[in-house]
Amino acid sequence: MKHKICIYAIARNEEQFVDRFCDAAAEADYIAVLDTGSTDRTVEKLSDRGVIVRQTTIEPWRFDVARNLSMLLIPRDTDLCVCADLDEVLLPGWRAALE
């Protein structure tokens, strides 16, 4: 059985990592990112790559709130979730290793 996998993340001003992140996560069924106030092209680049991306502001900053909000972007039919940062790179074969 093939599982539906979602890679999800929180981002802010990480446009320099978007392409590398999306390329590494390309085997995922879904990629979802909660942007917490970027002033660069992070949101635009993620959208252009087909990522599920939403924007919010969290004041005062609370990582737990950001993480919980990011999880709301995960589609309901997802079987496995992987949390990553945009500056992280998934190793080749990551999907097969999970399945």
Region annotations inferred by a language model:
Residues E27, R49-G50:
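Short, structured coil segments at secondary-structure junctions
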Residues I58-A66, M71:
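A short, glycine-/small-residue-rich helix N-cap motif at loop->alpha-helix starts
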Residues N68-L80:
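Active-site nucleotide-sugar/metal-binding loop of Leloir-type enzymes
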Residues Q16-D19, D40-D48, G93:
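Acidic helix N-cap motif at the loop->helix transition within catalytic regions
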